[in-house]
Amino acid sequence: MEISDDVTNPEQLWKMKPKGNLEDDSYSTKDSGETSMLKRPGLSHLQHAVHVDAFDCPSELQHTQEFFPNWRLPVKVAAIISSLTFLYTLLREIIYPLVTSREQYFYKIPILVINKVLPMVAITLLALVYLPGELAAVVQLRNGTKYKKFPPWLDRWMLARKQFGLLSFFFAVLHAVYSLSYPMRRSYRYKLLNWAYKQVQQNKEDAWVEHDVWRMEIYVSLGIVGLAILALLAVTSIPSVSDSLTWREFHYIQSKLGIVSLLLGTVHALVFAWNKWVDVSQFVWYMPPTFMIAVFLPTLVLICKIALCLPCLRKKILKIRCGWEDVSKINRTEMASRL
């Protein structure tokens, strides 16, 4: 069956997506004899009672089915980013003090080092969710039409955006859990006693630092709101939930609220850094701290998003996505392909 070329609206394609129940469909078919009886909901258990394993998946299909095909690229990217960030943080937090001052901080690896890796991976994966959409808009502007296929690598990337987003939410939740575990660490309690002893030695009655208090209150609040929006995005990506939404509702949540969560995560990292941007001691072996590297890609994505929202570009993108074609660019592309 061929789909007509007139069906190009995403909302129409959303309505065409099958949402029915398999049992209701099988019950409504006009089969005769025992087959129709077994397909009724009340007697469906009789059909599954005999040779369940043989009917569920034939032996020849067990060898041809792929194992998590849509998750391969996102998991590989997440593993690479996690490994590189871990080695980078290990070099800064553990190896550097060991080499320069013979101080051993290996106890930081299970919690502190890992908790610097998690936010870096989470915000980078979230940026990778929205970067291909902006690249696709640039490609459409360059081609002057929406009917020309995207490059294979971009097409594969766009199909994996859901998995990138779910992995980002997973790492963000781990980051929140690890952060909440800070006061439970024995090393933190020892450090707290040392800070109190130093305060007594310095004869300080109040150790309140106004700007540090504001810094922590703001970035914790931003982190909570950003994680809540990420949770909403993760819930709406569940098929049963997305099927209950209209195209406009689903598109609004995934696109608009997704960018808001990326913005909140970026500001969360910037406020966490506070005045460390100009602190020379933060640069170990001329290497910047991880939060400086973490905000680079999200900031680039947000800048590109703002640029594409300019009226001169936004109107043209909307016209192209509605079916308009730039004849001059199409003819130029055809002439270049012939040459």
Swiss-Prot record:
Name of a matching Pfam family: Ferric_reduct
Residue ranges, compositional bias (Polar residues): 1-11
Identification of the protein by name: STEAP1 protein
Single GO term (MF): heme binding
Residues binding heme b, per UniProt: H175, H268
Cofactor(s) needed by this chain: FAD; heme b
Recorded GO CC terms: endosome; endosome membrane; plasma membrane
Membrane topology reported for the UniProt record: Multi-pass membrane protein
Keyword Nucleotidyltransferase (UniProt): no
InterPro entries: Fe3_Rdtase_TM_dom (IPR013130), STEAP_metalloreductase (IPR051267)
PTM sites of type Phosphoserine: S28
Protein location: Endosome membrane; Cell membrane
Domain Ferric oxidoreductase: 118-265
UniProt lineage: Eukaryota, Metazoa, Chordata, Craniata, Vertebrata
General function of this protein: Does not function as a metalloreductase due to the absence of binding sites for the electron-donating substrate NADPH.
